[in-house]
Amino acid sequence: MVRYRLFGFAFGLSQLLFLVLLPLWLRLLSYLNPVVLAVVWMCLTVFVVFVVYYLCKETVNMPKRVIKILLSSYSVGLLILLFFRPMHQVYNQINYIPFKTILAFLSGNGNMLVAFYNIAANILLFIPYGVAALMFYRNPSKWQLGIVPVVIILLIETTQYLTKRGTMDIDDLILNLLGIWIGYLLYPVIQKVVRVK
């Protein structure tokens, strides 16, 4: 009974936070696919529930199958964000210079919400993949942890560029990899709450 109350509290808190920040999320719609609301909702809900459980030193047993379903749903949402953007945007640029785009965003000359979203989202949205890699592979090799993510992200960047659904940017690769590596570092913390069955 206590666990249900704790989950109810955590879930309610996450929904309240989502609603309070809804004006901010709605501003992203002019720049991104409307599915961004579902992705943000899912991320915020999971994050808040996790933090509440962690602070209360509670654990949750989760079948690997459920985690795979959640990760698959998340991945579909992320692919929609990456490849189905508003039609008025033009993408035909390539950036091979590390940190050029990041520094341009940090300069403060453009839209600060877009700048923050681009940097933060490129990191945060890839953290679950770092966690999942360690969750699903017991003893991953350096190849699996280092090279495979680089190849996958480069494939995404190339496909975005060729289909004119995004720019090909070395900074996206850097930020996405940073997100995955943060996921690796966070995995021991995640294990304290989520027990995979």
Locate the predicted segments by residue:
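Bulky hydrophobic segments
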Residues: 1-164, 170, 185-197
